[in-house]
Amino acid sequence: MAGDRELFELSNGRCIMDEDLSDKMYIIKSYHPERADETSSGFEWSEMGMANLFGMLYNREARYCTEHKSWYTYFEGAWRRDEGAILVSEKIKDFVRLMILYCGEITDDDTRKAYTSFVNKMGDRRMRDRILKDATGELRISATDFDSNPYLINCLNGTYSLEDYSFREPRWDDFLTMQTRFRHTVRRDVKCTRWEQFIDEVTQGDK
């Protein structure tokens, strides 16, 4: 998602101040989900259609592991088990709020009224739960996909690769659940006196 474009400005002049939600609104508008036909997005006016749209918007931050029968969410550089689906439930609430705001961007009066009536049904928690259940197929992941690269060390501030000795920003698609408790430092002047003493002892000073 683009992080350098302007915040999404609604037709009423207000801006969506959260950058991530703003990016999602740009994507929603580009698909025009109210036009559910073969020439457009194809997102049906149904729970299944909303599950498809939710899955497309949140695939970088929410996944359902069938083996563990649990949702996982990505934050602070790692995928973490979402016990009780608390975080993913908040994400679908954000999704519903975005869809309600999007209804105000529909220019055709009749379509806007009809689509608003449909979207408002997602205010019912039972409907949101059913959408999440449908979305498990869209966001399915195998347990073997997690931590599958043994050469990646996930630190608090990024990911270190043992293959090329590089350090980079964390990536959601590394699917790392394990994370160290320390921050990686690239400083060359950091020394461990005890370690150097140990090396000197075992080599008897022959460096």
Residue ranges of predicted features:
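P-loop NTPase catalytic core of nucleic-acid-dependent motor ATPases
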Residues: 1-8, 58, 62-87, 112-113, ...
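Extended, Lys/Arg-enriched charged tracts that mediate electrostatic binding to polyanionic substrates
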Residues: 37-53, 115-159
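Histidine-centered catalytic micro-motifs used for acid/base chemistry in nuclease
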Residues: 80, 87-142
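Modules that initiate DNA replication and primer synthesis
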Residues: 1-38, 68-101
